[in-house]
Swiss-Prot record:
The protein's name: ATP-dependent protease subunit HslV
GO biological process, one term: proteolysis involved in protein catabolic process
Assigned keywords, A-Z: Allosteric enzyme, Cytoplasm, Hydrolase, Metal-binding, Protease, Sodium, Threonine protease
Description of how activity is regulated: Allosterically activated by HslU binding.
HAMAP family the record matches: HslV
Enzyme Commission number(s) from the entry: 3.4.25.2
GO CC aspect terms: HslUV protease complex; proteasome core complex
Pfam families membership: Proteasome (PF00227)
Reactions it catalyzes: ATP-dependent cleavage of peptide bonds with broad specificity
NCBIfam families recorded: ATP_dep_HslV, PRK05456.1
Stated family: Belongs to the peptidase T1B family. HslV subfamily.
Organism: Actinobacillus pleuropneumoniae serotype 5b (strain L20)
Active-site residues per Swiss-Prot or TrEMBL entry: T2
Length: 173
C-alpha cells in the first residue's frame, strides 16, 4: 500500500509518493522509491500496488515511451491495450500515474487510461486522503507551488494512512 499524488498548478506538474513497503501487516522497508523520472527526464511516474508488478509495468511503460518518442497519451493507451490482451499482464496488481509538463494520466489496474477533470490525481491506500488535502489547498488562496501542495498532501495522508510513511520523494516537470 502507498500514497501517490499528482498536482498541476501554474504550468507545473508534481508527483510525490511515500517510501513504505509492507508485507501483510508488517513494514518491510521505509525507503522505497515509488516516483521516478524516465524518457530523458521529461516524464515522471508514480506507482502503487504490488512492488514487483509495479516494476514490470514501469519497464513496459518506459519501452512504450521510447517506441512512441515520449508521447504520453499514446504510450499509456498502447500499454493499456497490451495490459488487457496479454494474459500474463492481466494478473498484475498495480496502477500508476504518469505525467509530463502538460498532461497527466492514471493507468488503472484494469488497463483503463483516465485523464482527470481536476488538477489532482491520487492512488494507493492513502490516495483519497492526499487527494482531498491537495484539492483543499488548490481551492484556497495561497502561494503554494504544485510541489509544495504535493508535500503537504503526502504529510496529511501519512498521518492518517497506516500503510504510508513520511519518507517522501517528489519530482516536478
Amino acid at each position: 500500500m502507498t500514497t501517490i499524488v499528482c498536482v498541476r498548478k501554474d504550468g507545473k506538474v508534481a508527483i510525490g509518493g511515500d517510501g513504505q513497503a509492507t508485507l501483510g501487516n508488517c513494514v518491510e522497508k521505509g525507503t522505497v522509491r515509488k516516483v521516478r523520472r524516465m524518457y530523458k527526464d521529461k516524464v515522471v511516474t508514480g506507482f502503487a500496488g504490488s512492488t514487483a508488478d509495479a516494476f514490470i509495468l514501469r519497464d513496459l511503460f518506459e519501452k512504450k515511451l521510447e517506441l512512441h518518442q515520449g508521447h504520453l497519451i499514446k504510450s499509456a493507451v498502447e500499454l493499456a491495450k497490451e495490459w488487457r490482451t496479454e494474459r500474463s499482464l492481466r494478473k498484475l496488481e498495480a496502477m500508476m500515474i504518469v505525467a509530463n509538463e502538460s498532461e497527466f494520466l492514471l493507468v488503472s489496474g484494469s488497463g483503463d487510461v483516465i485523464e482527470p477533470e481536476q488538477d489532482v490525481l491520487a492512488i494507493g491506500s492513502g490516495g483519497n486522503y492526499a487527494k482531498a488535502a491537495a484539492l483543499a489547498l488548490l481551492r484556497t488562496e495561497n502561494n503554494l507551488s504544485a510541489k509544495e501542495i504535493v508535500a503537504e498532501a503526502l504529510k496529511i495522508a501519512g498521518d492518517i494512512d497506516i500503510y504510508s510513511n513520511h519518507n517522501h520523494v517528489i519530482e516536478e516537470v
